[in-house]
């Protein structure tokens, strides 16, 4: 899929994890993050990344040593973390409208509020973004 560069980018946890795993999408995702003027994320993103790191470590795909460093690198990708409480009302409305979980709609709410591109590896969330983002 071709992505349009944006001055503002909302980064979701799935994209961060793909970059850490060196997936086929990693280079494209990194380029979009580097070229964005501002990278934003809801507060939840770091918790979701931490949970993904735990799962990868638990499955034997990552060593325990270095997990904190990986989480720190995830945090360093973002210029501004938006508190979830500032997004919850809009995320709930989107969740009800789209029939999609509130925690994922936090990303959509932030992207919509900031007129930003959503960078995600979640194909369903990306499809929903086309319905609600400019």
Feature annotation, model-predicted:
Residues 3, 76-119:
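Active-site neighborhoods of divalent-metal-dependent phosphate/nucleic-acid chemistry enzymes
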Residues 28, 48, 90, 127-128:
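Phosphate- and divalent-cation-binding pockets in alpha/beta enzyme and binding domains
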Residues 1-8, 108-134:
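Acidic, PIN/NYN-like endoribonuclease modules and their adjacent C-terminal/linker elements
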Residues 12, 104, 122:
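Acidic active-site catalytic centers that drive phospho-/nucleotidyl reactions
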Residues 48-52, 70-73, 90:
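A general alpha-helix detector
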Residues 51-58, 112-113:
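Short glycine/serine- and small hydrophobic-enriched flexible loop segments
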Residues 1-44, 56-69:
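Short, well-structured N-terminal submotif of metal-dependent ribonuclease cores
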Residues 15-16, 45-46, 87, 107, ...:
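Alpha-helix capping/helix-boundary segments
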